[in-house]
Amino acid sequence: GAKSFAGPFTQTRKMGLMKAQIVSQGRVSLVLPDRLRWELFPPDEIVYFVTPDGLAYRNRSSQGAVRANDARTLAAGLDDLRAMLGGDLAQLRKRYDLKAFAVGDDVELEANALPSAEGRGMKAIKFGIGKDRIRPTFTRLVEKNGDSSDIRFGELRMNVPIDPASMHL
């Protein structure tokens, strides 16, 4: 099974009533079971780290940590993304109604927030897995306020060594 993966992505974020679009390039690294590094390249230039301790970030001018109980929406959303990318669907079942569909050679997973999950995490997550049944191909995150992020993964390298020091501040 997969123990880690790393590779590029393109993220298109739609925000606000006018649905302004921001397109970013980045790199994702995941070390199972519980470490995610989400890096957006310039001009965004920020790195998010999701670990069991919570959410941390670093950009050109600052860095900080947010404990798991603070900043719930962002931390929970990134934690849900980590769970989806890492295949920890049991964790998601607590807050989402999960469905899976075959689409050609790929599989798509859809997670819609349960009413009991209001105020925590995402409204919906859609996620694609390639024909190898391991490698993610895309994800769509819809926030409770209607903002969304569409992420297309490039060639993800599986089970590559990832420096543990790169997975936290």
Where are these regions (language model features)?
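Gly/Pro-enriched, hydrophobic low-complexity segments
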Residues: 89-169
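Short beta-strands and strand-coil junctions in structured, solvent-facing domains, enriched
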Residues: 16-17, 36-37, 44-47, 116-119, ...
